[in-house]
Amino acid sequence: GRINQKWRLNLSQEKFDFIERVISIPKEAQGESLHNNIRDILREVGVLEGFLSEIEYPLDGQRLDVAWRKVVNGVPTRVFEVQIGGNVTEALSKLKHANDLWNSEPFIVITDKDREKVNSLLSGTFHEIANRIRILTVADVEELYRQALAHIELKKRMGI
């Protein structure tokens, strides 16, 4: 009843407050902290979508920022690299390796300034994953999180 409704509201408010904190990070402080916040949002969206969602997922001596698996002993279904001022070539290399190894769906999160470089690398060196990879912006991830939370809240209100 009433307590449950209040709890749901507070849970929602907490999550919306989290995304607002992420969005309001000053531009000059965005490097690593924005990277980690976007990584954490992707992990949370994976959980909301019913995946086993992990950060810093191991990949042959390297780490993927986020990996979503369907089952405990399964391989990642979706893998994410968040590139906020980092090495785009290294990120694409990890995503290609995950795709080759596990047939995972690769996603790269970039800022607008890196779009041209990513497109150039996908038309050359990484052409094998050009048709599979999804290029997301920080704004795309923020919107995905908002929509996932709104969808959960709608289902709760409807009792579904």
Regions found by a protein language model. Give the residues of each.
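Broad gene-expression machinery/nucleic-acid interaction feature
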Residues: K6, R63, V79, E105
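Acidic-basic catalytic patches of nuclease active cores, encompassing PD-(D/E)XK
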Residues: R21-L64, R69-V72
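Catalytic core segments in nucleotide and nucleic-acid processing enzymes
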Residues: E81-D114
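Domain-level recognition of nuclease-like catalytic cores that cleave nucleotide substrates
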Residues: P58-D60, K113-I160
